[in-house]
């Protein structure tokens, strides 16, 4: 296993890593670095997560690694060896470039980047001591399948840590997310903003999801007119291409229009990727148990007294109240 670095040495290495690529998508992400959040706040968070999950001198898997910032921090601060996985090629390109730049500057960061769906990658069962996922599972196509795969990849006694703030119990976050969904589904201006300001490579061909659904329905050669297609496109929000095709056939056969899911309808019809789900932490806890995990613990994101004292409280109303004050939640689960 790699050596754990002191905070100052790790800080230097991480700054070199973060600025180690001029990938267009990464440059947009990096605009928040040092402005919306500080590197010291980030390092404190990673150290706290290493302590919470026992991620010290371990072999870890990060699911949905993005540009690998957390993976690099887990390796440098915790002495961990990390396999960092993301489904988006643009993300893994950025990770690879940052690792190469950091290495050229003398930083040997124990991160291996792999592109693909965690459910499809050829990884040996029981080969990881821990699995980490931060701000990623809200995009996953099939959470039950992902949790089952993670359970398979962990060794007995291994720990999974999920950190996320896409929390439907937080009123402000929920309303802001629903507003964003409406823009992503309907607005050409928003699609152009994604190309320009968010991820220029990933969103190069972005269009409103409703437009994509209308194109899919129109391509099926039915006798539906433009108004009927528009209504069906609205009703199939949250579906992928195969589901849209099946729903269209059902409607043409005389069945009622489908009803989009309340908290998971902003979805790319072609890739199946969710722009973002509004997650239910209590539902996720139950899904982890159903996937075979033990000792599943749900925690809120407060780390100061008095709210910190309520971590571990099993009362759903108390935790829902806490989540409405701050959306961040953490789930730990053992194999």
Predicted regions and their residues:
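N-terminal, positively charged/glycine-rich alpha-helical extensions of SAM-dependent methyltransferases
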Residues: 1-28
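Conserved alpha-helix/loop element of class I SAM-dependent methyltransferases that forms part
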Residues: 36-56
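Conserved class I S-adenosyl-L-methionine
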Residues: 58-66
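Class I SAM-dependent methyltransferase SAM/SAH-binding core
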Residues: 69-120
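A short acidic, Gly/Pro-enriched loop at the edge of an enzyme's catalytic core
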Residues: 119-130
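A short SAM/SAH-binding and catalytic strip from SAM-dependent methyltransferases
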Residues: 130-141
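Helix-to-beta-strand junctions that scaffold the AdoMet/dcAdoMet cofactor pocket
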Residues: 140-141, 154-156
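S-adenosyl-L-methionine-dependent methyltransferase catalytic module, highlighting the catalytic core
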Residues: 144-145, 149, 159-330
């Amino acid at each position: 296993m790699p050596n754990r670095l002191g905070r100052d040495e790790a800080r230097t290495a991480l700054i070199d890593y973060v600025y180690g690529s001029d990938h267009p998508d990464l440059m947009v992400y990096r605009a928040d670095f040092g402005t919306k959040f500080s590197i010291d706040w980030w390092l404190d968070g990673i150290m706290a997560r290493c302590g919470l999950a026992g991620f010290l001198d371990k072999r870890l898997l990060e699911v949905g690694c993005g540009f690998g910032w957390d993976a690099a921090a887990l390796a440098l601060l915790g002495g961990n060896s990390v396999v960092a996985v993301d489904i988006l090629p643009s993300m893994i390109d950025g990770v690879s470039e940052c690792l190469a730049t950091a290495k050229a500057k003398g930083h040997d960061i124990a991160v291996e980047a792999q592109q693909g769906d965690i459910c499809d990658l050829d990884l040996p069962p029981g080969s990881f001591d821990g699995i980490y996922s931060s701000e990623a599972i809200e995009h996953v196509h099939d959470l039950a399948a992902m949790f089952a795969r993670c359970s398979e990849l962990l060794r007995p006694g291994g720990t999974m840590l999920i950190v996320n703030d896409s929390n439907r119990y937080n009123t402000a976050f929920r309303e802001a997310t629903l507003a964003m969904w409406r823009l992503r589904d309907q607005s050409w201006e928003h699609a152009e903003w994604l190309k320009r300001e968010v991820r220029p490579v990933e969103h190069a061909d972005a269009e409103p999801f409703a437009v994509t659904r209308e194109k899919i329905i129109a391509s099926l050669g039915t006798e539906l007119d433009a108004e009927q297609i528009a209504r069906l496109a609205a009703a199939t929000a949250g579906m992928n291409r195969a589901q849209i095709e099946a729903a269209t056939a059902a409607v043409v056969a005389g069945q009622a229009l489908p009803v989009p899911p309340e908290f998971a309808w902003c979805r790319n019809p072609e890739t199946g990727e969710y722009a973002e789900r509004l997650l239910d932490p209590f539902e996720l806890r139950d899904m982890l148990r159903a996937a075979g995990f033990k000792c599943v613990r749900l925690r809120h994101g407060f780390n100061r007294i008095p709210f910190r004292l309520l971590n571990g409280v099993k009362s759903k109303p108390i935790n829902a109240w806490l989540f409405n004050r701050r959306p961040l939640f953490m789930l730990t689960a053992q194999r």
